Regions:
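OB-fold and OB-like single-stranded nucleic-acid-recognition modules
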Residues: 1-114
């Protein structure tokens, strides 16, 4: 898999997966679900970035839960992927224990969740 690093606005407007760094404001309370492919627990929430709304999906079986609330400002690094008809999704917001992907994170109030 090849990950491209580009400006966030270009990645948001594009169609190919891209590794991104950006800031955003949390819009929704996190919901938790069990990933059918990863077989792990995830948290997901929406956030508004400078380019538009994104869904952040974080694997909390790998990284600690990030206690975000609507209105919080966060910094995010992860892989942005497009889902037709929905806002782009940003995942891999945690370290990769298998060392196959760059490490991502969510930073909230100065604390790193990775």
């Amino acid at each position: 898999m090849i990950l491209r690093k580009m400006g966030f606005a270009a990645a948001y407007a594009g169609t190919a997966p891209a590794w991104v760094d950006f800031t955003a404001r949390v819009l929704t309370v996190p919901r938790f679900f069990y990933g059918s492919r990863s077989h792990s627990v995830h948290e997901a929430f929406e956030a508004r970035s400078s380019a538009g709304v994104v869904e952040i999906v974080d694997n909390v079986s790998i990284a600690p839960r990030c206690p975000v609330q609507p209105g919080d400002c966060i910094e995010v690094r992860g892989q942005l992927v497009h889902d037709p008809g929905k806002p782009p999704l940003v995942h891999w917001t945690h370290h990769d224990p298998g060392h196959r992907h760059p490490d991502g994170f969510i930073r909230l109030r100065g604390r790193l969740y990775a």
